[in-house]
């Protein structure tokens, strides 16, 4: 599937299960939030002949993938146990297929390099786990009053489809809108690429 600023194209095999179909459609739907609504200047007027990549694929794809799963449990399409199984599978795949720890911001900025293209699919695995961790931190610090969806709404209100952000300002902005612990987490695990202890 491929999203564009005014449309989405999706091609499916006839043999695709209904669960997989829901997963893909949910993911593509949440691209209306990011990157179609919240995105950086690097991708706002994307030049396919001279591409400049953003450092924030962890948000564009990871947060989107997390929302695609969270939406399904929130709407009763899957159970909480199924949601947790999906996230556990992502943890397993991230460790098995992409054992080398890497800075997600560096990978994102350099995703056109062949070496980085090989690990790009990890944004759908570890990227979703990073988003879940951010959600859990926000929920914990706010006593369950807020989550990552609230953060994305705030970013959407600040920026939007016609007002992109500077790549360098996103993490400080997220920290200001949430908690220092969120900024610390992003710095340690997304920017530095330290291994996450999910325990």
Residue ranges: model-predicted function:
Residues 72-84, 139-146, 178-183:
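Structural helix-adjacent loops and short alpha-helical linkers that scaffold large soluble proteins
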Residues 19-20, 24, 54, 58, ...:
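Soluble non-cytosolic domains of exported or imported proteins
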Residues 1-56:
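Juxtacatalytic substrate-recognition/specificity segment
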Residues 127-139:
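Alpha-helical scaffold elements that line and support the substrate/ligand-binding pocket
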Residues 34, 88-98, 151-161:
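Long, well-ordered core segments of solenoidal/helical folds
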Residues 64, 144, 186:
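Terminal peptide-recognition signature
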Residues 158-199:
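Beta/coil-rich, acidic/histidine-enriched accessory regions frequently appended to metallopeptidases
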Residues 39-46, 51-127:
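Acidic/His/Gly-enriched intrinsically disordered linker/tail segments
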């Amino acid at each position: 599937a491929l999203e564009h600023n005014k449309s989405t194209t999706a091609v499916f095999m006839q043999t695709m299960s209904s669960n997989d179909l829901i997963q893909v459609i949910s993911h593509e739907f949440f691209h209306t939030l990011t990157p179609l609504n919240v995105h950086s200047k690097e991708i706002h007027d994307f030049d396919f002949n001279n591409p400049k990549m953003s450092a924030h694929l962890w948000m564009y794809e990871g947060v989107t993938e997390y929302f695609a799963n969270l939406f399904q449990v929130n709407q009763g399409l899957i159970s909480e146990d199924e949601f947790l199984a999906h996230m556990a599978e992502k943890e397993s795949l991230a460790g098995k297929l992409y054992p080398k720890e890497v800075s997600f911001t560096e990978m994102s900025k350099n995703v056109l390099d062949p070496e980085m293209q090989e690990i790009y699919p990890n944004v759908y695995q570890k990227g979703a786990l990073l988003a879940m961790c951010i959600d859990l931190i926000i929920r914990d610090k706010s006593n369950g009053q807020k989550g990552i969806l609230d953060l994305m709404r705030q970013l959407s209100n600040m920026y939007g489809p016609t007002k992109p952000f500077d790549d360098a300002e996103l993490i400080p902005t997220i920290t200001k809108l949430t908690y220092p612990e969120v900024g610390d987490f992003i710095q340690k695990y997304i920017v530095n690429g330290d291994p996450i202890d999910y325990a």
